[in-house]
Amino acid sequence: ITAGVCDQIRQSVGYGNTNVKICASHAGITLGEDGATHQTMEDIGLMRMLPGMTVINPCDYNQTKAATIAVAEHQGPVYLRFGRPSVPNFTPVDQKVEIGKALKLIEGTDVTIFATGHLVWEAIQAAQTLQQEGIYVELINIHTIKPLDEKAVIESVAKTGAVVCAEEHLIAGGLGELVAGLLARNCPAPVEFVSVDDQFGQSGTPAELMKLYGLDSESIVKSVKKVLSRK
C-alpha cells in the first residue's frame, strides 16, 4: 500500500463502509534494501484514522492465516498488514483470531509489553532475557489495532503499572500512541515506545535496519529497564 491510494481508500471504501478487504504486503522498514521510497511506516496511522476501518497486524504465518479467515467472515472494510521478514511460526496452528481481542502470551507482574506484528517475536525474546534478570514481563499480542482491546490493556496496566509498546511503525499514529491515549484517560502509567521516531527509512538488510532504528529485542530490553526506572 502506498500513500497514493489513500484517497481512493477513503472515498471508495471508508466513506461508503464497503465490504472491502485490503491486504498490504511488505509493510514497514524491514522491506529492507528497497529503501525509504518503498518502506511504509505510516500506514497503520493512515488506516486507523478512517471511520469504520478495522486494522489487523498478525505476528506469524499461523496467525496471518487465521486472521485472513476472520477477515473474510467480517462484514466491513479491513486493512490487513503483512511484513516481509521470515519469523518463527510460534502461535498454535489451530488458534483462531477473534477481531478486537488481544492475546496474553506471557503472564507477568513488573511491566506490560504490548507488541504487534513480527515485533511480537522480538518481545518474546526480550521477555526471556529479562526473566533471567528477575524482571517479569506481561506480554500482550495486539493483533487487532483497531478496534483496540481496551479492557485487556487497562486490566494489564492496572496490574503492572508500566508499559512498553513495540511496533514496526512510526510513533505518530501507531499502536503506542493509541495505547498511551487510552491510558491517559483511564489508567495513567509511564510508557516507552519501541518504534520509529519521525524519520524515513533507508536501504539495508532487515536485521541491520531493526537494530539501527531500535526495533530489535535488545532495544525492547533497554526500553523495559527505562520505563521501570520511571515507576
Locate each region found by the language model.
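Conserved thiamine diphosphate
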Residues: 1-112
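Thiamine diphosphate
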Residues: 31-32, 84-231
